[in-house]
UniProtKB/Swiss-Prot annotation:
Organism: Homo sapiens
Function summary: Probable transcription factor that binds to the DNA sequence 5'-GC[TA][AC]ATTA[GA]-3'. Activates the transcription of the GHRH gene. Plays an important role in pituitary development.
InterPro entries: GSH1/2, HD, HD_metazoa, Homeobox_CS, Homeodomain-like_sf
Gene (name only): GSX1
Biased composition regions of type Low complexity, renumbered to the chain: 229-238
Keywords: Activator, Developmental protein, DNA-binding, Homeobox, Nucleus, Transcription, Transcription regulation
Cellular component aspect of the GO annotation: chromatin; nucleus
Superkingdom of origin organism: Eukaryota
GO BP annotation list: adenohypophysis development; brain development; central nervous system development; hypothalamus development; neuron differentiation; neuron fate commitment; positive regulation of transcription by RNA polymerase II; spinal cord association neuron differentiation
Protein name: GS homeobox 1
DNA-binding region: 147-206
Amino acid sequence: MPRSFLVDSLVLREAGEKKAPEGSPPPLFPYAVPPPHALHGLSPGACHARKAGLLCVCPLCVTASQLHGPPGPPALPLLKASFPPFGSQYCHAPLGRQHSAVSPGVAHGPAAAAAAAALYQTSYPLPDPRQFHCISVDSSSNQLPSSKRMRTAFTSTQLLELEREFASNMYLSRLRRIEIATYLNLSEKQVKIWFQNRRVKHKKEGKGSNHRGGGGGGAGGGGSAPQGCKCASLSSAKCSEDDDELPMSPSSSGKDDRDLTVTP
C-alpha cells in the first residue's frame, strides 16, 4: 500500500483523529443551555463552551446569589431549569445518608431526639442514683469501717497454758511457738503477740515493785538513826569537851603559880 508523505495528507489524517467518536461518554454536565452570549448573569470565571450548543459551567464559578437570588434576565430561569439544585445535592445528601444509617425510618425533630435518647439508654444502661447513699458527717461512727485490729479473746484454758509456759520460758523459739499454737488451737502470730505483751507487762510490774521497796526503806529509816552515824559521834565528842572544861587540871594550876612567883 503506497504511503503519501504530503502535507495535505498528514493534516487531513490529524483532523480525522481529533474528531470524537460517536460512542464517547457524555460530558460531566450533559445539559443543553443557551449560547454564552445569552447568559448575562454568569460571572467572568464561567467555563467557555467546548462544543456547539453545550456549556460546561463549574459550580464554583456560579455564586449562590445568582442561582437563588431575585428573578433577573430571562436567561437566569433557563439556567436554573437546566441545572439541578447542586447545593442540596452535594451538601444535604451525605447528611441524609448519615441520619438514615443511624436511625433509619425515624423523622427529624423532637420525636427523633427522644427516640435517640431512649435508644442510647437501652444500649448503655446507667445505674439508678437512688441506689447509692452518702454517709453524712454527723452519722454515728458505727457505720464507718473500723481500722483497728480485732482483739483475740483467749479462753481460760489457753490463758492458763500460756502463763505456765511464760513462767518457764519468757522467750520462745519458733518450733516451740508452733507447738503451742497447734496445741491451743491458735495461730503462730497470736502466740507471738501474746508473749510480747506479757513481757512488757512483766517489765512494768518489776519496775513498780522496785520503786515501792525503795520508798518504804527510806520512810522506816527516819525514826531512829542507824549505827555509826556521824551526828551521834559528834554530839558525844562535844559533850566530853564540855565536861573537861569544868575541872581545872593540876598542871595548869602549877604553871599559873610559877608565873605568879616570878613576877615582882
